[in-house]
């Protein structure tokens, strides 16, 4: 039996409840710490004297703090397991990244992270446990993977401005290391019935809003796949989930309302440095969703902020980078950079404009402007 979703169309939206509660959610794309970003953190630690064990990821992500820190609930997607502070670390295809990134994620304002992905089990159950222990130490909430079968049954519910908000996380199957049958509980694999069950348990525990992070789709495609579209249809007709946040494609895909519920198919990469950057893999989006209590559930509006990972050029042997070239990997709040360019070169500004234009186009590609109401975020960035 279909369940009516709490998010209704603009034409039939109920009135905002006088004195009703409200809160904002910021969500971003994959956190994927490639070796070049570890090298950058080592370089930055030498300059700042901050961080742990010679790694400081703070400068890398500082550019998004003015947005992320302003949300009432900020959700990241921690795609990979972490190793020990001094390593060893690994990149693609079996990631093992510095736990120091978790402290930085907390520092820029993230509250909780989804952890179910095709890389969750890259280094087995021991690495899953190490990752969740490190997230606990950093003060980050987590959902999608578990240290024990008992923990796998727990629901991540947070009080956000007096509203009980549950966060769920599910993924397609593991990448190179299939999860042993006896450890299937270690991370949530996509199954519509399992998602329904998790939502039901969240509601039983008092959740008033349920947000689902889902790791799905085809990598490097800016359009959702048929299985994504089919699952989005089922989620928005057979459950009461209030917001769907997608990851995995490593490029931006549309945000649209499906049967009255916002679905962000892919927010691209929050931070990554692929071995062969395409330009699209460096462009991402922060989804910004405002929930307002109405006389009949929740009205949800959607905004977005474009991000870009600045990457230093790779000079040919014996050559020096051109004057004014990017010197460090940095995650850029594109709108903020365009509004206050300072002494940025025309080449840099042109790159930022391209990121803004392309991201807007991909996000709008399934009709989100107009009737759906998706707009660029206007927010005072301190």
Predicted regions and their residues:
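Sec-dependent bacterial lipoprotein signal peptides
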Residues: 1-5
């Amino acid at each position: 039996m279909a369940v009516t979703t709490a998010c209704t169309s603009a034409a039939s939206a109920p009135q905002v409840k006088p004195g009703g509660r409200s809160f904002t959610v910021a969500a971003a794309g994959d956190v994927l710490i490639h070796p070049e970003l570890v090298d950058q953190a080592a370089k930055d630690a030498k300059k700042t004297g901050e961080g742990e064990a010679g790694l400081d990821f703070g400068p890398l992500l500082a550019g998004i703090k003015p947005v992320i820190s302003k949300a009432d609930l900020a959700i990241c997607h921690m795609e990979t397991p972490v190793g020990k502070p001094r390593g060893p670390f690994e990149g693609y295809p079996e990631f093992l990244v510095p736990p120091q990134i978790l402290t930085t994620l907390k520092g820029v304002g993230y509250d909780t992270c989804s952890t179910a992905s095709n890389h969750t089990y890259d280094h087995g159950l021991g690495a899953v446990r190490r990752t969740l222990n490190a997230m606990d130490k950093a003060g980050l909430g987590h959902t999608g993977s578990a240290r024990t079968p008992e923990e796998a049954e727990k629901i991540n519910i947070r009080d956000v401005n007096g509203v009980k908000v549950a966060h769920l996380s599910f993924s397609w199957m593991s990448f190179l290391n299939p999860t042993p049958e006896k450890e299937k509980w270690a991370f949530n694999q996509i199954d519509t019935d399992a998602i329904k069950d998790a939502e039901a348990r969240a509601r039983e525990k008092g959740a008033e809003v349920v947000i689902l992070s889902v790791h799905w789709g085809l990598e490097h495609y800016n359009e959702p796949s048929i299985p994504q579209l089919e699952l989005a249809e089922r989620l928005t007709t057979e459950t009461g989930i209030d917001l769907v946040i997608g990851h995995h494609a490593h490029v931006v895909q549309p945000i649209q309302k499906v049967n009255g519920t916002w679905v962000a198919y892919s927010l691209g990469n929050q931070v990554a440095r692929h071995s062969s950057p395409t330009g699209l893999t460096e462009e991402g989006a922060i989804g910004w969703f405002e929930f307002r209590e109405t006389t009949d559930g929740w009205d949800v509006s959607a905004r977005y902020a474009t991000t870009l990972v600045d990457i230093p050029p790779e000079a040919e042997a014996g050559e020096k980078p051109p004057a004014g070239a990017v010197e460090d990997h940095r995650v850029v709040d594109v709108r903020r950079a365009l509004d206050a360019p300072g002494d940025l070169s025309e080449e840099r500004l042109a790159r930022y404009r391209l990121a803004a234009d392309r991201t807007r186009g991909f996000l709008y590609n399934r009709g989100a402007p107009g009737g759906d109401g998706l707009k660029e975020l206007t927010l005072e960035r301190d």
